[in-house]
Amino acid sequence: MENNNELKQLEEKELSSELIYSGTLLNVYRDKIELPNGKTTGREYIKHNGAVCIAAMKEDGSVAVERQFRYPMHRIVTELPAGKLDTPDEIPLEAAKRELREETGITASSWTYLGDMIPTCAYSTEIIHMYLAEGLEFGDRDLDEDEFLNVS
């Protein structure tokens, strides 16, 4: 938790902001800022709507995982079901329910909010909202046309 004195010592203040790239997933900005010592510098960062991540707990105590090729990494990775918020004001729990069903075909009768994670705060505004899903029922997936993944 921050206090006012610490905020005065550490806060960087925006002087100007420029959108340098606008995409379907994220927007990139370049801001001119004033440092706590009064000097100015630049910051480049990504504005992101946010995301959700779901630990879908099966009856045997294991969790559902996905395997998919992640282009930036150029390899197949194992992940928990997750997805982005469609809009900045989308309710995270609704996004979590949607993403779990679309990607895995799983619906859950019980949802527990686990907290938020900020994975890359040095250069992104993305916040990942974490949920535990229990009481699972398995059905058909509804993947986006550009999604290819395996679920176990």
Q: Predicted regions span which residues?
A:
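Basic/polar N-terminal segments that are highly enriched at the extreme N-terminus
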Residues: 1-10
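Conserved Nudix-box catalytic region and its N-terminal flanking loop in Nudix hydrolases
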Residues: 9, 43, 53-98, 147
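Acidic, metal-coordinating catalytic segment for phosphate/diphosphate chemistry
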Residues: 12, 16-53, 59
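Short, solvent-exposed loop/turn elements at beta->coil junctions and helix N-caps
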Residues: 16-19, 116-120
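Active-site-adjacent beta-strand/loop module that shapes the phosphate/pyrophosphate-binding cleft
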Residues: 29-37, 120-140, 152
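NUDIX/MutT-family hydrolases
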Residues: 49-51, 145-152
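Short alpha-helical functional segments enriched in proximate histidine and acidic residues
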Residues: 103
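A short coil-to-beta-strand element that immediately follows conserved catalytic motifs
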Residues: 107-114
